[in-house]
Amino acid sequence: MSWQTYVDEHLMCEIEGHHLASAAILGHDGTVWAQSADFPQFKPEEITGIMKDFDEPGHLAPTGMFVAGAKYMVIQGEPGAVIRGKKGAGGITIKKTGQALVVGIYDEPMTPGQCNMVVERLGDYLVEQGM
């Protein structure tokens, strides 16, 4: 299965009538493996900060997490595995696997829990596959 298929069929799937605003699978260096049509472009320093937070949980908490220049308040995730952020009525979930970052961005009416489920389910599957 191609990386784009994972984005199109697994991350952008419909859940209770809603779906993510955008999603992507990136390499740890920020290289885009696949993305939805309107996924925002990460800046290199944003990826560096996100990867540092996975290595040093709490690194982003004081400053917030930036994605394409937009600031997200970092909320409770899973240290070293999942970073979650909130911005207005929406937010972001990032799941780290051995080789990739699985990213989902949502807006209402999708809920944070629905976003977490979609992103973390695919991330857990990729971890099981050695990715």
Swiss-Prot record:
Keywords: Actin-binding, Allergen, Cytoplasm, Cytoskeleton, Disulfide bond, Phosphoprotein. Phosphorylated by MAP kinases. It is found in: Cytoplasm, Cytoskeleton. It holds the Pfam family Profilin. GO terms for cellular component: cell cortex; cytoskeleton. A motif (Involved in PIP2 interaction) lies at residues 81-97. CDD domains: PROF (cd00148). GO terms for molecular function: actin monomer binding. The modification Phosphothreonine is found at T111. Disulfide bonds join C13-C115. SUPFAM superfamilies: Profilin (actin-binding protein). Gene3D superfamilies: Dynein light chain 2a, cytoplasmic. Its main location: cytoplasm. The variability of the residues taking part of IgE-binding epitopes might be responsible of the difference in cross-reactivity among olive pollen cultivars, and between distantly related pollen species, leading to a variable range of allergy reactions among atopic patients. Belongs to the profilin family. Occurs in many kinds of cells as a complex with monomeric actin in a 1:1 ratio. Binds to actin and affects the structure of the cytoskeleton. At high concentrations, profilin prevents the polymerization of actin, whereas it enhances it at low concentrations. By binding to PIP2, it inhibits the formation of IP3 and DG. This is Profilin-2. It comes from Phleum pratense (Common timothy). The gene is PRO2.
